[in-house]
Amino acid sequence: MSGAKVYCAALVVLVLLSAGCNGSKMKVSGQVTFSDDGSPLTVGMVVMESGTTRVSGKLDGKGNFRLGELDDGDGVPFGEYKVCIAGCRETLPSGFPGEYLIDSKFERPEHSGLTFVVKSDGPKTFDFKVDRPTKKLKLK
């Protein structure tokens, strides 16, 4: 076998072996609950953004989420993130969201006040508390 073929074969093996390594990512999960009574937010999504990365995870019926770049739970690159949380009942046939379950301040990372840092020696679980929507004034 020529030197070039050996090099290419070794490179392929190295790439295949490293594909399973997750040195720069961490599995991250957590739960979203309401600040007033501790009950879980059971519908919605958690989205985290850094300058270059966006990860997300859907909430399950107990308010739990697993984060990932491509799929829920595939891991989060190390770094500092701003967090936003979406929570509404379901999308209406008109395409508009249904009833909002959380305060609108949580919809945008720059307004939510929620952040977290993912690092190799840091926590792997991040729990968030959200407020219910503020009451709307009724016009008479």
Spans of model-derived segments:
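Beta-strand-dominated extracellular/periplasmic modules and repeats
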Residues: 21-140
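Sec-dependent bacterial lipoprotein signal peptides
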Residues: 1-19
